[in-house]
A protein has these predicted regions:
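N-terminal membrane topogenic signal
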Residues: 6-21
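Juxtamembrane boundary at the C-terminal end of a transmembrane helix
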Residues: 133-143
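Portal/gating segments that form or line small-molecule/metal binding sites
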Residues: 32-114, 143
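Interfacial loop-to-transmembrane junctions
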Residues: 112-127
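Small-residue-rich segments of transmembrane alpha-helices in multi-pass membrane proteins
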Residues: 81, 125-133
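Short amphipathic, positively biased membrane-proximal segments
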Residues: 3-9, 94-98
Length: 143
């Protein structure tokens, strides 16, 4: 059943609010955490990009939850990548960044198998995480 064709379910809206709260809370911490290497983005663009990325991440998690439920393998990876994202921003170690990126890619693949719209919605967040983490992990240097 299409979400737009169905009656609004208060449970779904509460779940969406929780996904948004969790993702945007991690995003808020991530945006103010110390950056050991400058992100190659104009400073004025960082806050809107973080907000958009984590907002899309929340919507993708919610879409996947609607399809597969809370106890799914895909949402386990989603929660793990969100937790790794928070921990990596507080302690940007290369191994944590690699684990975060691998977990985000696994989440993308699992979402694609279960809910294509969730995967497409999650893709910008994966690209943003890769874009931000690669220079911080020293995969390339900015001079």
């Amino acid at each position: 059943m299409n979400f737009l064709d169905s009656e609004p379910d208060p449970k779904q809206f509460r779940a969406l609010k929780l996904f948004l709260l969790a993702a945007l809370a991690v995003g808020a911490v991530a945006s103010v955490a110390a950056r050991p290497v400058p992100v190659p983005v104009a400073p004025w663009a960082v806050a809107p990009l973080w907000t958009l990325s984590y907002g899309l991440m929340a919507v993708a998690g919610w879409l996947a939850w609607k399809r597969v439920g809370l106890k799914s393998f895909a949402l386990g990876f989603f929660a793990a990548q969100l937790a790794l994202n928070l921990v990596w921003r507080l302690a940007p170690l290369p191994a944590l960044g690699l684990a975060m990126n691998l977990c985000a890619l696994a989440t993308l693949i699992l979402f694609a198998r279960r809910n294509f719209v969730a995967a497409v919605t999650f893709l910008p967040s994966v690209i943003w995480c890769l874009f931000v983490s690669l220079p911080m992990n020293g995969f390339w240097r900015l001079y």
